[in-house]
Amino acid sequence: MLLMTLISTAALITAQPAPAALGAAAVLAAPGEARSEIFDGRNWTCGPDGVCVARGPGVSQPVSRECRRFVVRFGVVTRYERDGAALTVAQLAQCNTAAVR
């Protein structure tokens, strides 16, 4: 009986759909109007609060390059992460140099 209960529970747990994963996220230093843009294989959506989220697999590239390409289009960031790992303060400083060129 216990074995059947465990099997049924395991079947229910594995049958649940996985939540849609975010590909990347960023926080803009100077929030502006809400906007949405598709580039580098991701659908970026930024709210008026400066919080940006991206969905999609993205182009295969180092995260530092992806961040630089993002700030060229959207502006300086105070946070940038991909696949759940955030850039360090030093990495963010290097990334943000692309915005002032």
Question: Language-model features: where?
Answer:
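Post-signal/leader-peptide non-cytosolic segments of secretory proteins
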Residues: 20-100
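Classic N-terminal secretory signal peptides
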Residues: 1-21
